[in-house]
Amino acid sequence: MKTNADLTTKPKPAGKSFLRKHSLGLGALAIVVTLVVAYMRADPATHLGSFFGNAIADWTGVLVTVIMTKHLYERGSAESKQPKGKLRSPILEFLRGHSLTVFLVITWIGWAYLFRRMDTGSRWGQVVGNLVSEWTQILGLVWMTKILIEVGSKEGAR
């Protein structure tokens, strides 16, 4: 016979699935892929084609923000998690503490280099130009969250 304790004990919830744990990143990735496919089929000279090209850069920025802010750090930013512990090498500690900026700067240089070598008026040249702009905005926002505050945000609570 079951006791009252047995009847009131809730079963342990099952572990969250991969899809549940990563649904935001996967959702953003699905949107980027959908936009790339739509852009490949659209005429970039039309409003709709132009929209798809611009949206690729915007949503790639969302994807990078979701994924990279989960795994990388930016010391001094209230919006970023802070690294635990300290590394022995001051150089490695600096790179880890600013790994989000390091990643964004390196990939920004890559996008800028690619853009410089492309025809800016070509289909993908416009998209890559928008990606350079998007990366500049993300990097600027990361740095601004280290210095500036906004009432009601995490920075404003400092």
Regions inferred by a protein language model and the residue ranges of each:
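Membrane-helix interface/capping segments
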Residues: 73-87
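Short, Lys/Arg-rich, polar N-terminal cytosolic tail immediately upstream
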Residues: 1-17
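Short, charged juxtamembrane terminal tails flanking transmembrane helices
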Residues: 3, 156-158
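Polytopic alpha-helical membrane-helix bundles and their juxtamembrane interface segments
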Residues: 12-13, 28-45, 105-121
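Alpha-helical transmembrane segments
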Residues: 23-27, 59-63, 99-103, 135
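A structural feature that tracks compact, well-ordered secondary-structure segments
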Residues: 39-41, 45-71, 78, 113-150, ...
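N-terminal membrane topogenic signal
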Residues: 14-25, 93-99
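Transmembrane alpha-helical segments of multi-pass membrane proteins
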Residues: 88-107
